[in-house]
């Protein structure tokens, strides 16, 4: 089978031969039909990979501290080799996968062979995914639409933390893929929505989905526009889906919010906060974690132990289901978010488009090779140049 891997040393992406994962207890083996390239996360990963070693360090200061500590204990040369080795490890890209269940592991009762499912599997012909990270697709939802379910769940979890009520005014800062999906879900919750972004084409889509818009790139003041949008009382909540190194989105969110307003960070921003902005209004600020409860919990994800329904209503899997239900009901429209479609074998072209077109949103990969071909076992030998002076001699027996 084939899979997309990224070289973290230089940011290059390749479609390469990889071993077919073996289905195991509590897992599904899925034959992929469609996958969505996450414009935000994957563009950030590719950009990080292409950065110099110094720029990589600047982007991850917490890792620099770990490296410096390792230098003190293990020495400079050993640490340098360890860093280079870490960067040389290829990274599997993708987490928005749609496919057909090919095999069901022991202990899985809610899925069967032939089911159409979404999962957070990577960009690959065949993926093995824990059952709690999969959800069945309704018959009237296409594979292309369903591929947006996982990324939409990221926005949905932010909404759940914000707890919007009918008629409230909300701001979505960052009208990228997650932001535009969040806008639609807030509108479905009966909220008035203001979208803030520097990209007018994305704001035009936000307006199409029923939001008011603000473009700071045209000299519009987000705080003033937000206060006017709230009719002078301050907005009830702000969901930040932007990705930026500066703290402006959080600062602006605090200043446009009403007393006891809610601010939810779904994206990535700087966090240099002014205490007075939050103290005087008793604002709530919370960082949202991915798709929802269960994320990064090995008991839930890897071992398949679900949370009690009565205590955790919305797990990450149940968020997947909720998004798919909205699509089935026509409440969530992703068709305008599809920018381009590529054959899986041409994925490198898709990643070129991802880095070249900053306005791009939904890039879809289509998988058309026969399942039998994907399951063929092949051995791929990578050429290695050996210098005689670096030869290693070993003895067996």
Q: What does each model-found stretch correspond to?
A:
Residues 162-164, 204, 209-288:
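Glycine-rich cofactor phosphate-binding loops and adjacent beta1-alpha1 units
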Residues 4, 228, 232, 237, ...:
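C-terminal capping/lid region of NAD(P)-dependent oxidoreductase domains
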Residues 116, 142-220, 224:
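Mid-domain Rossmann-like dinucleotide-binding core that forms the NAD(H)/NADP(H) cofactor-binding site
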Residues 121, 197-198, 289:
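Conserved acidic E/D residue at the C-terminus of a beta-strand in Rossmann-like folds
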Residues 37, 111-112, 164, 257:
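Short, well-ordered loop/turn sites that connect or cap secondary structure elements
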Residues 273-336:
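C-terminal substrate-binding/catalytic core of Rossmann-like NAD(P)-dependent dehydrogenases/reductases
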